[in-house]
Amino acid sequence: MREVISIHIGQAGVQIGNACWELYCLEHGIQPDGQMPSDKSLGGSDDSFSTFFSETGSGRHVPRAVMVDLEPTVIDEIRTGTYRSLFHPEQLITGKEDAANNYARGHYTIGKEIIDLTLDRIRRLADNCTGLQGFLVFHSFGGGTGSGFTSLLMERLSVDYGKKAKLEFSIYPAPQVSTAVVEPYNSILTTHTTLEHSDCSFMVDNEAIYDICRRNLDIERPSYTNLNRLIGQIVSSITASLRFDGALNVDLTEFQTNLVPYPRIHFPLATFSPVISAEKAYHEQLSVAEITNMCFEPHNQMVKCDPRHGKYMAVCLLFRGDVVPKDVNAAIATIKTKRSIQFVDWCPTGFKVGINYQPPTVVPGGDLAKVPRAVCMLSNTTAIAEAWARLDHKFDLMYAKRAFVHWYVGEGMEEGEFSEAREDLAALEKDYEEVGVDSMEDNGEEGDEY
């Protein structure tokens, strides 16, 4: 089997973890106590779920996951919540004091105390796998644990499991709303440290998801639960190919092969459609062409940036439900003709398609409508550089005054790390810029389009 281990770090990672595992359980017919009612196990020969769940002797299904936080409150909610008997107590790891939004605490002082325990638990999960294909790491950029501890763990995973794929789902600080003043510092430090250890990083920004909840689901004041369930749908779409059999199956390494043209350019933009409330879905049936089209609308994206200003390097369309290749091909053809979608000139084709016949599942009583088909688009576009530029600018404003820096230095970090990280991100922006520039071999013919 090709197992995948999920690692959920810090408050954001753990709460997204809750949403994801809730959804996986519904999709696979696993009850909150880990039992799978017998009719399923008799009728379906489909055991693809074992990439994400391991089965115990007593017939319980345990997620291949670890949840880590440097303070206990968030994970305590799992220990007392609906899914308390789904996880093995050893999979829920908590420290005693939090990282206080400080990368240095998560990476050096507090994180150090818990890293070996965490790696030990991950090792146990890995030993339980027959053919581990890699790790999914969920965290935020802005928090202390999410930034500092994640980068520490990624470094150690690279040492212990060199060639295994590591994919991240990262919550990027929203442009307007902020949960911590020092988010730009944490984000840039963690990106710099993790850049060489991560194979592919799907970024999600809270503000973009707030807007989607407001606009598409008419939720006046979205809560984290609303946001996380939507993120859960995206994660589920991306991992569906690992958990179900489909016509065109995609595994972890296949994502990288198709989405990452250069090792550093590994931040695809995720878009999911249709995000639609039950009342609306009752009145409209969305075709493959329509949902595919919706993916190219900037307001359906999970990060605020405008692909119309950038160029696409690769696009991966993951369909689920009632979808046939003929419709997909037609939809893509239409988009290619009528859209102002620009591909970089060195990557002319650029569409990869995956189809899974398992229809999308929704949490009962949630905000999302049950739809017969959905699509998740992962696109590697140069426009995401806007997000880095935004963050770098905020970093510069604070760092010019050395604001808050003493908190980091006081936890054993050197000030040089700030400038080193900032230079690395400047280089990353430059990389994106260069990828988008047309190749030199234009003999003047293509130059007339602009």
Swiss-Prot record:
Family annotation (InterPro entries): Alpha_tubulin, Tub_FtsZ_C, Tubulin, Tubulin/FtsZ-like_C, Tubulin/FtsZ_2-layer-sand-dom, Tubulin/FtsZ_GTPase_sf, Tubulin_C, Tubulin_CS
Reactions this protein catalyses: GTP + H2O = GDP + phosphate + H(+)
Keyword Magnesium attached: yes
Gene knockout outcome: Touch insensitive phenotype, which may be due to defective touch receptor neuron synaptic transmission.
Expression by tissue: Specifically expressed in neurons.
CDD domains per record: alpha_tubulin
Description of post-translational modifications: Undergoes a tyrosination/detyrosination cycle, the cyclic removal and re-addition of a C-terminal tyrosine residue by the enzymes tubulin tyrosine carboxypeptidase (TTCP) and tubulin tyrosine ligase (TTL), respectively.
Cofactors: Mg(2+)
Pfam families listed in its UniProt record: Tubulin, Tubulin_C
GO cellular component, as recorded: axon; cytoplasm; microtubule; neuronal cell body
Positions of post-translational N6-acetyllysine modification: K40
Any single GO BP term: detection of mechanical stimulus involved in sensory perception of touch
GO molecular function: GTP binding; hydrolase activity; metal ion binding; structural constituent of cytoskeleton
Membrane-traversing stretches: none
SMART domains given in the database record: Tubulin, Tubulin_C
Active site: E254
Chain positions recorded as Mg(2+) binding sites: E71
EC number of this enzyme: 3.6.5.-
Marked site: Involved in polymerization: Y450
Keyword Cytoplasm: no
Subunit architecture: Dimer of alpha and beta chains. A typical microtubule is a hollow water-filled tube with an outer diameter of 25 nm and an inner diameter of 15 nM. Alpha-beta heterodimers associate head-to-tail to form protofilaments running lengthwise along the microtubule wall with the beta-tubulin subunit facing the microtubule plus end conferring a structural polarity. Microtubules usually have 13 protofilaments but different protofilament numbers can be found in some organisms and specialized cells.
Similarity remark: Belongs to the tubulin family.
Role of this protein: Tubulin is the major constituent of microtubules, a cylinder consisting of laterally associated linear protofilaments composed of alpha- and beta-tubulin heterodimers. Microtubules grow by the addition of GTP-tubulin dimers to the microtubule end, where a stabilizing cap forms. Below the cap, tubulin dimers are in GDP-bound state, owing to GTPase activity of alpha-tubulin. Component of the large-diameter neuronal microtubules which contains 15 protofilaments. Plays a role in mechanosensory transduction (touch sensitivity).
Name of this protein: Tubulin alpha-3 chain
Organism: Caenorhabditis elegans
Top-level taxonomy: Eukaryota, Metazoa, Ecdysozoa, Nematoda, Chromadorea
Gene name of the encoded protein: mec-12
